[in-house]
Structures are given as structure tokens and as C-alpha cells.
Amino acid sequence: MASEDVKTDRRYTKDHEWAQPHAGNVRVGITAFAVDQLGDITLVNLDVKAGDELTVGKAFGTIESVKTLSDLFAPISGKVAGVNPELEHKPELVNDDCYDKAWMIEIVPSDATELEGLLDHATYAELLKTAHH
């Protein structure tokens, strides 16, 4: 992944998820690097619903591809505001538009400083350079 595939308007995790401030909440999805590693997405299973509480690192679902099955983890703590209803019927959206249309969950953050503790775009871009062995 080239560094231009790293959006500057969000934070990142070492697990290749992104967290983007959105109307007072935080939307969560996976990065282009993660999509590239997974291949064609066949199923997105979100195990949470609006009102559920999440803590950092708690699994909130799985993503399945032709290659593998991966867990999805909450990058911040908070209450689930909603899940992306499109992904249940259109998992391929993740391949097509992982940064916008294929957001997975939206969280009402319980601690705004957790978002600041995630990787900024420049740090994440550096991480990607070392991911290419």
C-alpha cells in the first residue's frame, strides 16, 4: 500500500483498522492494507447492535474473505451508536470503498483521549513501510 492510501482525516490501529470522527461519534472500518491482505470479502458479521458497550480491544465482529476469517476489534471504548446496514447484504463494499461506504460500526466514545492515542496517518504510513517485507 502506498502512503497515499492512508487518509489524513482519521486515526489507525496496528491491526489495520481506522477510526474517524463523524458528527460527534467515531466510525470504524478496516484499511486498504487490510483489504489487500484479506482479498475478496465474502461476509461481514457484526456481532453488536446500537446500545451495546464496547471496550478497547473487544471483538465486535468478524470479516470473512476467500483467504481467511479475521476478528474485528474496537479501537476505542464507548457505546455502539449503529452498524452499517449495507454490509450484511453487500460485503463487497469493503473491497470497493473501505474508507467511506464500508464503515462498519459507529461508536459514541466514552473517552475522547483514546482516539488521540491511536496512530496518526504519518505513523500508520511508516508502519505500512515495515509491513512490506
Can you describe what each PLM-predicted range is?
Residues M1-A59, D96-D97, K101-H133:
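Acidic, low-complexity mobile loops and tails
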Residues R11, E53, E64, S70-A74:
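Small beta-strand-rich domains/subdomains or short beta-sheet motifs embedded
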Residues A19-P21, L46, V66, V83-E86:
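Residue-level recognition of beta-strand microenvironments
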Residues P21, S65-V66, P75, S110:
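A short, compositionally biased micro-patch
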Residues N25, S77-K79:
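Structural motif
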Residues A59-G61, V66-T68, E86-L87, D111:
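Short, charged beta-turn/beta-strand-edge "cap" motif at the junction between a beta-strand
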Residues A81-I105:
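Aromatic- and Lys/Arg-enriched surface recognition patch
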